[in-house]
Swiss-Prot record:
Protein name in UniProt: DNA ligase
HAMAP family associated with the record: DNA_ligase_A
EC number(s) from the headed UniProt entry: 6.5.1.2
Disulfides per UniProt: none
Primary gene name: ligA
Organism: Sphingopyxis alaskensis (strain DSM 13593 / LMG 18877 / RB2256) (Sphingomonas alaskensis)
Amino acid sequence: MKDVGSLTEAEAANELMRLAKQIAHHNKLYHAEDSPEISDADYDALVRRNTAIEEAFPHLIRADSPNRLVGAAVEASPLAKVTHAQRMMSLDNAFAAEDVEEFAARVRRFLNLDEGEPLAFTAEDKIDGLSCSLRYEKGVLVQAATRGDGTVGEDVTPNVRTIADIPQNLKGDIPDIFEIRGEVYMAKADFAALNARLLAEADDPDKARQFANPRNAAAGSLRQKDASVTASRPLRFLAHGWGEVSALPADTQYAVMKAIESWGVPVSPLLKRCDGVADLLDHYRMIEAERAELPYDIDGVVYKVDRLDWQARLGFVARAPRWAIAHKFPAERAQTTLEAIDIQVGRTGKLTPVGRLTPVTVGGVVVSNVTLHNRDEIARLGVRPGDRIIVQRAGDVIPQVVENLTRDEPREPYVFPDHCPVCGSEAVAEDGEVDVRCTGGLICNAQKFERLRHFVSRGALDIEGLGEKSIAEFLELGWLEKGPADIFRLKSHREELLAREGWKERSVDNLLAAIEAKRQPDAARLLFGLGIRHVGAVTARDLLKGIGDIARLPGKAAELRAWVEANPRIEGESEGKYAARRLEAIKAILDVRADGIGPAVAEALGDFFHEPHNRVLWDDLLSEVSPPPYVVETRDSEVSGKTVVFTGKLETMSRDEAKAQAEALGAKAAGSVSAKTDLVVAGPGAGSKLKQAASLGIRVIDEAEWAAIVAAAG
């Protein structure tokens, strides 16, 4: 990796683009999916590299810079969205005593304080949990929300009401409005007991749900659609701050936290008021020494300026307050032997290498497995079975390999598989991506359940009565072995189904009727239901607007693949010119003009239909269903040819219905606001998109005005 000072402007721009994409990917995994794949230390290193490049090239700072963003968007969450009255911020990090000293010096410079003037802070342990905001009105809990992207989170009010640590009513003299913010977490002992219980309750111990660590367990338990699941999990809460308030009970951070504690909400027992940096560092060392004995996982100590009037003067940078910083703990390390490398296949087909280790204790925890992330990471480390390695456990979460001590020893290099170990399908990596994915899709047992669940979901075929439990049952019985086409053959198992526990004649017949009603499905929904990478609901509609008949899709996919093979980049042709030439060919072959269809979609289609298993699956499916040709009837309207964005809660129609209306009026329904947007339709709770539209001078209307436009088009 080049030193930042030696980067050219073009290299800096390219690296910032790569880092923005990479950090956003890891933010989504950590905050939205509760399945991080790199350690805190590796994540922090990416952010530090991004910050260093931005400081050297400030004119190259991107709109999607990680330093401007908090958490991850909750677009895909099944939970209702909540717009925070006051943004939930992140924290900047310190990794050494010098960083803490510089933080204090920055505060002094900003406030114009003399060196001898007292500067007090609070210090408390940084719990590794899920951030949550509790809104109390007149002392009564009325809403709870996750952080999400800092602006919009998920509504988890029913779930939070089941957590014993969180009072439904505060006691004492409470301001009319007071949002308490803190961490939902799971204690180490409770985490171990939960995994043991899930194992004991499982019919098949090999298939028992097991959480990787307490943070994942806490996040997965809180973000449930069914609050009774949350109630069965041992969740706890510690407050560390506040959001919107109508009044404050004191004028210092420490005093307000003590007031919150007096109202009945737990705060950290390690919270302390510190006079100066030396006192902060003493408290940090004390907490670090006791870390292994604490009942919960922590990954550092948070320092905050104590005086609230000084906090107000210091204010915020893009994603974090100037008056607070998180002092992270160094990673803990140990030596061991890499015994084997296994490949796990995830629900999206991603092949993840997992290192099997001679068990070793790292930071008080026995580690026997470690993620190796991807084939590039294996190549970078040069690891092979038999190597002696150093394992690091950073942030009390994910163990990782940081060094191969025997890479120079002569031994055959590890060869990453080019076929799926589960189903034998080709495993490929798309251009510009490090992840290798199985192309088997629905014929791959590792992916089959999730793909079938997606196929029958509301956005796809929307088969009522065919939920997760039924799909799992039918898969176990072998009734869905060939993929989605077998759904339409379930009627042949009617008598067997009636004989099974939990199935009555009415429920069986209702399910079979719902399936039969989808024999002529909307072609775009059918295509979306296949779960082809990069082919979402909007892309599926855009594709079918061009090709019309879905039966033509495999042929078009073959044309796309053939064009790439027959048209390599010409010597002397710039990458940009080749990309433009390829994009033009893609749009000509598919007869589309939509912005969202380009090389990624073309490559995904080509890979999917090139796989023989998928062609068999496709032909089998079309033998059971007959989607009519896809025809988009458009009407003349004032939005014809324009780009429309819907944001906020729509009260008279679903988001899908609104997008369909826009397309019927000849408009394009986009998911994000940009300079190309012509109109924004905003419902209650509209947040960042509405602000962006205002800053760009884009026309904004409400749902009633949109209904008038639709009505006027006839």
